[in-house]
From Swiss-Prot:
InterPro entries xref list: Syntaphilin/Syntabulin
Quaternary data: Interacts with STX1A and KIF5B.
Modified-residue entries (Phosphoserine), positions: 54, 111, 400, 557
Lipid bilayer topology: Single-pass membrane protein
Key words of the record: Coiled coil, Golgi apparatus, Membrane, Phosphoprotein, Transmembrane, Transmembrane helix
Entry protein name: Syntabulin
Segments passing through the bilayer: 609-629
GO CC term, one of those recorded: Golgi membrane
Organism: Mus musculus (Mouse)
Gene (UniProt): Sybu
Lineage of the organism: Eukaryota, Metazoa, Chordata, Craniata, Vertebrata
Compositionally biased tracts (Polar residues): 85-101, 168-180
Length: 665
């Protein structure tokens, strides 16, 4: 049979189906003539007990509608998501009753024009109240799309068994779709068509059945125009019903695909099975898990960064703490050093203060020794004057023999004067030893002054004991003849503890001394002369030249010293050897006074020119010798700079510090 004939038969079948049901929406049509015989036969043929399937499947596979029935799948089953899984809200496939005459519910037949205009419409008739209830739940239909897949019952999750269904499309191209049977049995389309033989078919049904029986499993009909639809990827049931004969479809395109009649296709996510929903949920959860893991990794990385930053901050803090502790320790050490330095400074100050005190005490001791030396010199001068006066008294006594008694008394006192001079010499030697002693007490000065006062009083006794007028007459004669230099001494002391008590002591000592009663003059005259001389001696002895400081005094002793020139030089050399006191000589040079007999000339050179020339030119000789010896470049020179300086000091300085005093007569 050619393809043209087959296409004609298909058009007839489609036209009959279109006449039966042109719309998916069920319409109740009252049929007044319904044969009861066919209804009874239908009830006998399809009892619920004979069907191995469920009650719903026995209704769906009723043999009374086998000839002209065409199974349809709701339009919701053809909507799937991007994974190819059908929706979960799809209903199980239902069959449209082929015989409208035997069904109480029918559809209005349409004309051929409606058939050509609406090829995508599929009629569906609900069987009984269950089918009508299903259609009430799904009032809206969709357009059958090409390449539709087999739908699964929503009761597949509960374990119900759905029969294999084959849908024959009424559009221009027919596609065969195989459904998976999740039950233990599978039915073929041929079996259902053979079962429908019990009902008296119409002539059109006979042609359709004969066509299906003729080519149930012929391999010639299964060519590329017949292709099974791809099963669902999410269904885990075994592929049952694959042995059923495929439904023929025509390789063509829809003539009016874009005519949706105002019906919008629903979202594919609304038509997923629970398993597919689980898979989608798992996918979403996996994506969320990945996102949470990514966030977790980010948080962990941030935590690690914060931990590393915290570790760095901790290290920095520890380092700063170490620096701070080191600084504190260094500060403590510095404070300790400062304290030690302060202690050292205090000790140095105390030691310096002690040294200053010692130096001041040393200066005081030096001044005390100076006072002792001054008093010693004065006592020596007084003793020498007394010895000269004793000699004059002796000469005068030899001239007057009647005065033997005073002469004897004078001789008796003369050894005392000589012994006094020896005692003064010994005291000078002792004072030379006491010059280097810096710890001498200040009380020694008072003792020495008392001793000097006693010696002076003894000297004055000799003066008073001698006849005053004769001695005074003889003294200028001798001094004029022999050309003796007369000098007035004035020695200033730095600190002399002068008080009225000392002067009173001296006066009392002098008053106790008796003058000599064996003078040639009368006692009244001698007493008057002695009193005059006593007052003059006291006034000459103690004279205050510094009224600004009442505790310091200058001892001025105008004593006439009749010497010869050689005796004067010998006495000066003896004093220089014993004392070597240059300051005293300088003070003597400053205190030279002019007298009425003549003028005193200050000279720094000696009377002999050769001596002065030798004193100046003597250091030149070792200097020249030293210069030649150093330029000669030989061994060690005979003279060095030390020898030169020593020679200069020995030769020149000793001669220069000796001073001679001449008086023009």
């Amino acid at each position: 049979m050619g393809p043209l004939r087959e296409s004609k038969k298909e058009q007839r079948v489609q036209h009959q189906e279109k006449e039966i049901s042109r719309s998916r929406i069920p319409r109740l049509i009252l049929r007044p003539h319904r044969p009861q015989q066919q209804q009874q036969q239908q009830n006998k043929v399809s009892p619920a007990s004979e069907s191995p399937f469920s009650e719903e499947e026995s209704r769906e596979f009723n043999p009374s509608s086998s000839g002209r029935s065409a199974r349809t799948i709701s339009s919701n089953s053809f909507c799937s998501d991007d994974t190819g899984c059908p929706s979960s809200q799809s209903v199980s496939p239902v069959k449209t009753p082929s015989d409208t005459g035997h069904s109480p519910i029918g559809f209005c037949p349409g004309s051929d024009e409606d058939f050509t205009r609406k090829k995508c419409r599929i009629g569906m008739v609900g069987e009984g109240s269950i089918q009508s209830a299903r259609h009430k739940k799904e009032p809206k239909g969709g357009i059958i799309k090409p390449g539709s897949e087999a739908d699964f019952s929503s009761s597949s999750s509960t374990g119900s068994i759905s029969a294999p269904e084959v849908h024959m499309s009424t559009t221009g191209n027919k596609r065969a779709s195989f459904s998976r049977n999740r039950g233990p049995h599978g039915r073929s389309n041929g079996a259902s068509s053979h079962k429908s033989g019990s009902s008296p078919p119409s002539p059109r049904e006979k042609d359709l059945v004969s066509m299906l029986c003729r080519n149930p499993l012929s391999p010639s009909n299964i060519h590329p125009s017949y292709a099974p639809s791809s099963p669902s990827s999410s269904n885990s049931g075994s592929y049952k019903g694959s042995d059923c004969s495929p439904v023929m479809r025509r390789s063509g395109r829809y003539m009016s695909c874009g005519e949706n009649h105002g019906v919008k296709p629903p979202n594919p996510e609304q038509y997923l099975t629970p398993l597919q929903q689980k898979e989608v949920t798992v996918r979403h959860l996996r994506t969320k898990l990945k996102e949470s893991e990514r966030r977790l990794h980010e948080r962990e990385s941030e935590i690690m960064e914060l931990k590393s930053q915290l570790a760095r901050m901790r290290e920095d803090w520890i380092e700063e703490e170490c620096h701070r502790v080191e600084a504190q320790l260094a500060l403590k050490e510095a404070r300790k050093e400062i304290k030690q330095l302060k202690q050292v400074i205090e000790t140095m100050r105390s030691s310096l203060a002690d040294k200053d005190k010692g130096i001041q005490k040393y200066f005081v001791d030096i001044n005390i020794q100076n006072k002792k030396l001054e008093s010693l010199l004065q006592s020596m001068e007084m003793a020498h004057n007394s010895s000269l006066r004793d000699e004059l008294c002796l000469d005068f006594s030899f001239d007057s023999p009647e005065k033997s008694l005073p002469l004897s008394s004078t001789f008796d006192k003369l050894p005392d004067g000589l012994s006094l001079e020896e005692q003064i010499t010994e005291e000078g030697a002792d004072s030379e030893l006491l010059v280097g002693d810096s710890m001498a007490e200040g009380t020694d000065l008072l003792d020495e002054m008392v001793t000097a006062t006693t010696t002076e009083s003894s000297g004055l006794e000799f003066v008073h004991s001698t006849p005053g007028p004769q001695a005074l007459k003889a003294l200028p004669l001798v001094s004029h003849e022999e050309g003796i230099a007369v000098m007035e001494q004035a020695v200033q002391t730095d600190v002399v503890p002068f008080s009225p008590a000392i002067s009173e002591l001296i006066q009392s000592v002098l008053k106790l001394q008796d003058y000599c009663p064996t003078s040639s003059a009368s006692p009244d005259e001698s007493g008057a002369d002695s009193m005059e001389s006593f007052s003059e001696s006291i006034s000459a002895l103690m004279l205050d030249l510094t009224p600004r400081s009442p505790n310091s005094a200058i001892l001025l002793s105008p004593v006439e010293i009749p010497f010869s020139k050689g005796a004067m030089e010998a006495h000066a050399n003896r004093l220089m050897r014993e004392l070597d006191f240059a300051a005293y000589t300088e003070e003597r040079l400053d205190s030279v006074l002019s007298l009425s007999q003549g003028s005193v000339v200050r000279q720094y050179w000696s009377s002999n020119f050769l001596v002065d020339l030798l004193a100046v030119a003597a250091p030149v000789v070792p200097t020249v010798l030293w210069a030649f010896s150093t330029q000669r470049g030989g061994t060690d020179p005979v003279y060095n700079i030390g020898a030169l300086l020593r020679g200069c000091c020995v030769v020149a300085l000793h001669s220069l510090r000796r001073t001679a005093f001449h008086m023009k007569t």
